[in-house]
Amino acid sequence: MSEINISAAAVKELREKTGAGMMDCKKALIETSGNFEKASDFLRKKGLAAAAKKAGRIASEGLTAAKVDGLTGVVIEVNSETDFVARNEQFQDLVKDIANFAVIAKTIDTLKTFKMQSGKSVEEEIIENIATIGENLTLRRMDILEISEGAIGSYVHNEVVPNLGKISVLVGLASNAKDKAKLEALAKQIAVHVAGNNPQSIDDSSLDQALIERERKVFFEKSKEEGKPDNIIAKMVEGRIRKFFSEVVLLQQNFLFEPKLTVAEVIKNAEKELGAEIKIAKFIRYELGEGIEHEEKNFADEVAAITQG
């Protein structure tokens, strides 16, 4: 078949409609002689064959999602290769559906085999979406938060649609306080705080000891270089460790909404107001793509290369 002339505008329009890759869109338009609807169908039919090839590509964009159902909450991360796909409604619907099932599934292995409304498993549904969207997609991780009594607060930062965004946080407050609305409001505020301040643990006893020792060593060596006496160094190191705790331990951080108070002090005040003990049972904070290698691409160059090639 001789290649017909396909405009960049047509390729862009098909990509916006289907979410498929630029090269796949151009190929589909060529194969269907520029017929837009047939090209869309072509992508749906042919995509599955290409899904395996796409599975090896780096997927560091996408969305995180938070879902709360009563006293159970989950956070998931589903990755795509580009931010463009994260704005695609089909991909957003997929992430929403997976989050809804995650609350029931409890573990990621169970979630992958969970049957969706289509009758396909979550894993099969992801593969089919790799086909139609044209990028590697991965259900990277999930975590669950369950409490027997209290409230769960959720917050999603940089939302693209409700409950889907770049950072998703859950905070579980264990309490028998009667005023659930106030307890939920506090949990929500702490969730916003966690999103912005990225604590590493709830208290200093649960902080990674290896991390503490690493920081202690850095502080010690820095003080040594300053030529301080050993007895002064010991005091300086402990002072810097306390400051380190105030930066990374949730209960010791200055509260985002009342900076003059620590999170622990805010909780104490809430306990007095609500007449009940309040304990942070757990928090989960997922930031999109953390720990994944990113691959930079120039969208304009990609369009030019594909439409000219």
Swiss-Prot record:
Cited SUPFAM superfamilies: Elongation factor Ts (EF-Ts), dimerisation domain, UBA-like
Keywords: Cytoplasm, Elongation factor, Protein biosynthesis
Gene3D superfamilies (alphabetical): 1.10.286.20, DNA helicase RuvA subunit, C-terminal domain, Elongation factor Ts, dimerisation domain
GO cellular component, one term: cytoplasm
Domain of life, per lineage: Bacteria
Localisation: Cytoplasm
Gene Ontology MF term list: translation elongation factor activity
Region: Involved in Mg(2+) ion dislocation from EF-Tu, residue numbers: 82-85
Family: Belongs to the EF-Ts family.
PANTHER family membership: ELONGATION FACTOR TS, ELONGATION FACTOR TS, MITOCHONDRIAL
Function summary: Associates with the EF-Tu.GDP complex and induces the exchange of GDP to GTP. It remains bound to the aminoacyl-tRNA.EF-Tu.GTP complex up to the GTP hydrolysis stage on the ribosome.
Protein name from the UniProt record: Elongation factor Ts
